[in-house]
Amino acid sequence: MCPPQAQAEVGSAMTEKTEMVCTSSPAPAPPSKPASPGPLPAEEVDHRNTCNPWLPPGVPVINLGHTRPTGAAMPTTELSAFRPSLLQLAALGTAPPTLALHYHPHPFLNSVYIGPAGPFSIFPNSRLKRRPSHGELDLVDGHQPQKVARRVFTNSRERWRQQHVNGAFAELRKLLPTHPPDRKLSKNEVLRLAMKYIGFLVRLLRDQAAVLASGPSAPGSRKPPAHRGVEGNARCGAGHRVEAARSQPVLPGDCDGDPNGSVRPIKMEQTALSPEVR
């Protein structure tokens, strides 16, 4: 039998260990190393023989009273070392729900362009222009046929205007002389060549008008216009008589008392010209 002092030491050690195990966390304790089957120290063998005489020989027995001092307390640094990791795991476990609040499953219904911008948006809504998608355009067009009709009319009018402008440029291009006749010109070149060509024609007409105005013209080259009527016939008759009198030959002996035979002027011109002719 063991002495009462040894039994008291063993009992106190066992109670301390049970209290420490109960107060510790449920973390698994490291497995204890099995005792080697080698020979035991002489002190343990003597103590085993004295305290536990009922155990068979060869069974290893560890004396708790000698391995750990009685007044020593188990350090809690190893148990407290696991607590920060548990807190970190708990914090990480609660983080995904906060991110899930800002996650939009459908980009069409909740997007940056339509819905309110979250804290993770790069640009504010004031700088972004709303551009509806194709599906939204179809929905809007289906509910507003007037806008569709107005859009179709605007597109057709713009197409018609563009066709007329192109036709006018083609007609103007045909009137412009170019060195290669089949030279392709842009609209800008057509307009510039048209301006130059029009200016050239204006200068040409101006020069021709100046030449015609400053040209020499004889005073008797132009014939008076023929007037029909009694006055015109009388003038024509008097003129014919004057020409006939001038064309008659004058004889040298037929002079009125002029022995020298000098030619006297014929006074028929004065008699022929009546006051009406003058």
Swiss-Prot record:
Q: Its domain of life?
A: Eukaryota
* Stretches the record annotates as Disordered: 1-52, 213-278
Localization annotation: Nucleus
Instruction: Tell me the ranges covered by the bHLH domain, including all copies.
Output: 149-201
**Presence of the UniProt keyword Hydrolase in the record:** no
CDD domains from the UniProt entry: bHLH_TS_LYL1 (cd19705)
Pro residues bias: where?
27-40
Q: Which GO terms describe its cellular component?
A: nucleus
**Which Pfam family, just one, is annotated for this protein?**
HLH
Query: Is Coiled coil tagged as a keyword?
Result: no
Provide the alphabetized UniProt keywords: DNA-binding, Nucleus, Phosphoprotein, Transcription, Transcription regulation
Q: Enumerate the InterPro entries for this protein.
A: bHLH_dom, HLH_DNA-bd_sf, TAL-like
Q: Which GO terms describe its biological process?
A: B cell differentiation; blood vessel maturation; definitive hemopoiesis; positive regulation of DNA-templated transcription; regulation of DNA-templated transcription; regulation of transcription by RNA polymerase II
* One annotated GO molecular function: protein dimerization activity
Task: Name positions with the PTM Phosphoserine.
Answer: 274
Q: How does it assemble?
A: Efficient DNA binding requires dimerization with another bHLH protein.
Q: What is this protein called?
A: Protein lyl-1
This protein's gene is called Lyl1
